[in-house]
Amino acid sequence: VPLEEDPANKWYQRAGFPLELSGREKKKLDERKAEVMPEDTACIMFTSGTTSRPKGVMLSHFSLVNNSAEIARQMHWSQKDKLCISVPLFHCFGITAGILCCIHSGAQAHLLKYYKTVDVLEQVEKYRCTVLNGVPTMFLAILHNQNRSQYDLSSLKSGIIAGSPVLPVEYQEICRELGMKHLQVSYGQTEASPCIAISDYEDSLELKSHTAGRPIPDIEFAVQQSDVIRNESMEG
């Protein structure tokens, strides 16, 4: 087996190939790890934010790793879970609350190339997915799909609903119809990698339908008006 271009035309026997390769890979990994610092930029995510023109947001390794670890912990995800990832991977929702959370928790990741309601229904039924994240319009599209009753979605247990506001009556209907007791309402922004607040896992559906949750660890909130910090009970 030719491992790589070698001036001496060195070849490796099949039996020794895995050991040689793993040794080289470990050395490369150790060298790379020594070069990377937690505060270094891991990726650049684009967000339109308050304008229609996309802006690049530099997210650090520290921010992405810690945010996803906390999401996985708050959601109680484990190796027993299977995530149906239907949100795009070019967005924090897909990367942080999807791929990275699976790495932290050991959960399976089932990816969809594009979002189509019927594809989500088929994926959940086929792989018995336990977790489904999405924006309110995605959940409502599933809810109102005329063929939904033809699919077995009983495996769904939890997920995150975020990205835009959802009416209390709509949220409760989604939870009730899909049987998702632990569909957690969350608030975030790309600059925060993205989760800022999330409802408590054991909060009632009534409470979760009227709140975006509590701040996660290492997140600080401030109510501000005209550069003046306001009290918690005041508007800002």
Regions from the PLM with identified roles:
Residues 1, 55-58, 85, 107-114, ...:
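Short beta-strand->loop structural element characteristic of the AMP-binding/adenylate-forming
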Residues 7, 12-17, 23-46, 53, ...:
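Conserved pre-ATP/AMP-binding loop-to-beta segment of ANL
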Residues 41, 47-50, 83, 89, ...:
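Conserved S/T- and glycine-rich ATP-binding loop of Class I adenylate-forming
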Residues 129-134, 143-207, 220:
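Gly/Ser/Thr-rich phosphate-binding loop
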Residues 39-52, 57, 68, 72, ...:
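ATP phosphate-binding P-loop of adenylate-forming
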Residues 65-82, 90-131, 145-146:
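Conserved AMP-binding/adenylation subdomain of ANL enzymes
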Residues 222-236:
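Conserved beta-loop-beta connector loops within the AMP-binding
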